[in-house]
Amino acid sequence: MAIHPTAVIDPKAELDSSVEVGAYAVVGPDVRIGAGSKIGHHVVVEGLTTIGEQNTFFPFCSVGQAPQDKKYAGEPTRLEIGNGNTFRECVTLNTGTVQDVGVTRLGDDNWVMAYAHVAHDCQVGSHCILANNATLAGHVTLGDYV
């Protein structure tokens, strides 16, 4: 495991031995990261977040933060990310809400470009492309190959 000395990894986080974590990245206690994933510098991964294998997060992504929903009151909700996804600079991915299924999900082999946002309770299939600054409001569902 290649972890930069300035990265902050909670001892309760579960990272595969092949995960790479860049400078000043933060990984919280309830995070699981699968084999071959790369967490770039200044990326923050928190919340109840599960990241599959071979995912790449470019600098300044915010992953697994609380949903931007006025009804959210700190309930334990989740973010689940499949395998082989690429998240470019400054992407934000929020957890779900109890008013819906309680989980935000992204499938496999998605390409999420810079400054895109995937809000609470979104269900994104596999092989999707979200262009720069694309924003999915809460509860949006995208099928595969969108």
Regions from the language model: what does each represent?
Residues 2-146:
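Structural signal for interior beta-strand "rungs" in well-ordered beta-sheet cores
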